Amino acid sequence: MEKKKFVFIITHSYDRPDLAAGAMQLASNMVAFDMELDFFLMDDGVLLAKEGFAETLTWQKKDEFSPVHELMKTLIDDFGVKFYICSSCVKHYELDKVKLVKNAEIKPGSFLAEMLRDRQALTF
């Protein structure tokens, strides 16, 4: 049986940390069940790719989801999940001047369109 493939489109970070955490919690559960997935970060979500940024998200609701930085570490280190960054957002969020997290790559919107040809999308 062919693996199901997904792309998680994340558009929030500091503005809605619980939304980002919920997406990553779901993704962690899905990869544990052998589903293939990666993330495409857009708008405020691109900040998650900035090294050290996820650790600053300390105002999540208590006892709801694991902290964003812990979820990202698990997804990257244990499951090899990639975090693609929308190239149109790079200059606006000054990501061209900082170090990115492991498994982060800058890609154009057309790359997301290509991914959507054979993947289901979940947007947060």
Q: Which role fits each region the language model picked out?
A:
Residues 82-87, 93-101, 105-106, 110-113:
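A short aromatic-anchored loop/beta-hairpin motif
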Residues 8-21:
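Short, glycine-rich nucleotide/cofactor-binding loops
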